[in-house]
Amino acid sequence: MSRMESPLEVPLSGGNVSQVVLVADTVRRVPSRASGTIQRLLNYPTIAALPWIPDHFGFDVEGRECIQFVQGAVHHAEPDWLWNEHILLQVACKLREWHDATIGFDRTDTIWNLLPRSPDEVICHNDFAPYNLVFEEEQIVGLIDFDTCAPGPRIWDIAYAAYKIVPLVPDDSVPYETVPTENSSRLNETELRRRLELFLKCYAGQDKNLLYSVEHTITTASERLLVLADWTAAAARNTMNSELPVHESMYRQHSNWLKTFNNKS
C-alpha cells in the first residue's frame, strides 16, 4: 500500500485552519482556500531547498493536503530553555532565511487565507512562533503550519516573532494597563530591550537596510496584535469557540501595553 493510500490515521494537535492527522510519514489536512497557493509556495525552489521546510506532496485521494511530517518536538508548554539566548538567535536567523527564500515567488493567481499587506516585500509566515517550530535537542529542525502565509513587509513578521520569542509581553501577575516597570514584564526594561536588539541585529546580519529599530518593532507589534484581535473576534463569531474571545482580549491588552512601553521609552 502506498503512502498516499495508507488508512492508518493519528490525530495531531495544532493547525490554524483545519484538522490535522498523521498518515505514515505525512501530515494530512483538509485544504483551505489557500492550499493550492501554499503547495506552490513550499515547492518554490529556494524554499524547497531549505532543509527545515517540509515538502508538499500535493493532495491525497480524499483531496487533503499531503505534507512531509517533520520529526521532532513542538513545545506548546514553553520549557525554560526556550528563553535561552541561542534560541532567540536561531529564531531570528530562521525567519531571515524564510523571508529571503520567498523573494521572487510569483504572486499571479495566488489565493491567501489572510489579506496581503503593503509593502509586498516577502511572503510572511504570519505565525512564526515557538508552537510552530519543531525542535531536536534545542535546535530548530522544522517550521509548520503555513495556512496564514501571505505577502507583506518583513517587519510585520519580525514584530510578531519578537513578540513571541523575546517575549514582548507583560507579566500575567500585573494588570496589562500598568505602566511598564521592572516588575511588569517577564523581563526588566533593560533586558527586554537588549534581547530585542539582539534579535533585530541577528535578523539583519550584514544588511544595515534590514536593521529595524526597537521602537519601530514595538509599534508594529502593537499594530499587529490589534489586527490579530480583530481576526480572532471574527473567528469567534463564526465558530462560537468560547476560548477565542479570551485570546482577543489578551491581544488587545498586550497591544495597549506595548504602546505604553514605547511611550515610556
Locations of the language-model features?
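Actinobacteria-biased recognition of intrinsically disordered, low-complexity terminal regions
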Residues: M1-G14, T260-K264
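Short, polar/flexible loop-turn hinges at active-site or ligand-entry regions and domain interfaces
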Residues: A77-W81, A150-G152, V169-V174
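ATP-binding pocket architecture of kinase catalytic cores
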Residues: L8-H125, A129, E136-Q139
